Amino acid sequence: MWPAYFVVAPGRKRVPSLLLSTAARDPWKPYPVPRFEPFAAIRYATDDLASLVAPPYDVLSDADIDVLKARSPHNIVRIDVPRGGEDRYVLAAKTMRAWLNDGILTMDSEPSFTVYRMRFTDSTGVRRDIAGVLGGLEVVDAEAGGVLPHERTTAAASTDRLDLTRATAANLSPVWGLSLAGGLTELLAEPGEAVGAVIDEGVEHLAERVTDQERIAAIHQRLASDDVLIADGHHRYGVARMYRDETREATGRSDTPAELTLAFVNELIEDQLSVAAIHRLYTGIEIADLADALGRSFELIATERPNSKSLATLQQEGFLILVGRDAAWQMRAKPGRFDGVRPLDGGWLETALADIPLTVSYQHGLDATLSEVDSGHASAAVLIRPVSVAEIERTAREGLLMPPKSTFFRPKLKTGFVIRSLT
């Protein structure tokens, strides 16, 4: 097992943290940073993966799953999103074993890291080349530090992911982490051995295996020098913690593969992140009442319903947009109303509507959000601005938490490039 490191990064500010504990922490005390280790990956035997990989399970509709299953009898959704009754997890595990026995899936003969690149043009016309690394990220206790959430999470109502992990004894889809260690992007610039490429919806996804021991050590040591912030996959990481605890109780050991979980980690810097907003949908309240409630905290100016171009312009000017079926308003915070509140649209809305009886849900994408309002599924929506990368870094550095569903990281990682065995 690779060694663990305990450091305080130069210039790192440690403060009492709403994130980790209500108790004050010694700002000069060294806290553990997580291990990040290579492993012998399970991969498809072919590098022609277009019909085999899939988006993450939590963004797939039933129709999406049908389309993916129709592409190939070996598409990863047949394991990652099993259908059926109570035996569906057992069937998923049997399918995975059968694919391994039949050579559809193969396990590498030695531990490796996998460099994962996503190349695309974002919604602003900027060319992006996001480079991260797939490996085994240490599963730490909720208050231990090292692996940090960046937003409050809603309670998971289903045990689906834990049941699937128990049955398959595998990590099927990665957590997305952001490393606060500088220089990771430069370290990943050199290509590795190509093991798969897919182009989907304008995004080129590439996977490259790294087995060179010096390069593995360099990546490991760089990631061992600072914290990792969870960008996407808070629930998956929580499931990994539950599975680790079950394994410890069953085996009496703390050195099994369950001590780590599959993660993609890239550097927390501006050119390595593409962050979109997750808009707010409101039900249980009439649009007039919602406008009245928001009008106590925001200046509301009647406007036309925005399109993608006008929304971007309004957001750059500092506006949020309240949208109903037949009306829309520009919203600008009243002077002094949110003094002492972090400059996050989601937090401002929570503060403004704290005493108003309503239900809030979340939707990314302008068209999908407006569709929810037009269909009557929501009374109204508030279109919010994307969170800045600087504010995400502040969240990590100061041990803070954003409101739920504050960030939507794009593009979504594909499931199926790499599977990590837990046996």
Predicted region positions:
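Aromatic (phenylalanine/tyrosine) cluster motif
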Residues: 5-6
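Surface-exposed, charge/polar-rich loops and edge strands
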Residues: 18-423
